[in-house]
UniProtKB/Swiss-Prot annotation:
Function: Catalyzes the conversion of acetoacetate to acetone and carbon dioxide.
Catalytic activity: acetoacetate + H(+) = acetone + CO2
Protein keywords: Decarboxylase, Lyase, Schiff base
Pfam families: ADC (PF06314)
EC number of the protein: 4.1.1.4
Protein's name in the database: Acetoacetate decarboxylase
Species whose genome carries this gene: Clostridium botulinum (strain Eklund 17B / Type B)
Length: 246
């Protein structure tokens, strides 16, 4: 392969890349979100400067089922997002994400800054209950439940929930371990159609695990829940802060 051809490739292996080029379009992307109140001191230890926490110590536990994703296929994802602000702009800091699809993990980490790891989340309906679970290896890490489609949620309110700016850390070392890239990244979903949105009674259980430490942000009180069905396009990220520039 010519040098000029190598430089045009998106990733490795050269003849079987881990993921194709975007854009990445999601059809029937399903969200199950639970916003809960947690320990303020625990949040302060986690959220990186220059992001700022609000007065209310909140976390969004999110489950996402993505059965039809261009280039990436079908997968499910689970994570925690923390409401923050940057220079007065409100959004969510993406703390952890666990999913069951290698191409989605690779593209999320390489082309953006999504904090993705391998896990085994599931989102399903059990009788009259929407259920989300996360296993890390063979151990259960989280169980979320919500009454299935109890009360309709305003579609504009649902869109606002999904379209909040996301903030992420991009960290890549040099080959000797010294810092090479250390940036704060922002991305915001704008191309979206919300088909349905619901709310209902919800509960969330988190279990201690060293490698999936969701319970480091313990559940003190459930604030709200939502079940939202969408089509959307994944946005391109932008650098908003460089930790290595003095």
């Amino acid at each position: 392969m010519l040098k000029s051809e190598v430089s045009k490739q998106i990733t490795t292996p050269l003849t079987a890349p881990a993921f194709p080029r975007g854009p990445y379009r999601f059809h029937n992307r399903e969200y199950f979100n639970i916003i809960y109140r947690t320990d303020a001191d625990a949040l302060r230890k986690i959220v990186p400067e220059p992001l700022e926490l609000g007065e209310d110590p909140l976390v969004r536990f999110e489950m996402m089922a993505m059965p039809d994703t261009s280039g990436l296929g079908s997968y499910t994802e689970c994570g925690q997002a923390i409401p923050v602000s940057y220079n007065g702009k409100k959004g969510d800091y993406l703390h952890m994400m666990y999913l069951d699809n290698q191409p989605a993990i690779a593209v999320g980490r390489e082309l953006s800054a999504y904090p993705k790891k391998l896990g085994y989340p599931k989102l399903f309906v059990d009788s009259d209950t929407l259920v989300g679970t996360l296993d890390y290896g063979k151990l259960r890490v989280a169980i979320a439940t919500m009454g299935y489609k109890h009360k309709q949620l305003d579609l504009n309110e649902a869109k606002e929930q999904i379209c909040r700016p996301n903030f992420m850390l991009k960290i890549i070392p040099n080959y000797d371990g010294t810092p090479r890239i250390c940036e704060l990244i922002s991305a915001q979903i704008k191309d979206i159609t919300v088909h349905e949105a619901w709310t209902g009674p919800a509960r969330l259980q988190l279990f201690d695990h060293a490698m999936a430490p969701f319970n480091d942000l313990p559940v003190k009180e459930i604030v709200s829940s939502s079940h939202i069905l969408t089509d959307l396009t994944l946005p391109s990220p932008e650098v908003i802060y460089d930790y290595l520039k003095k």
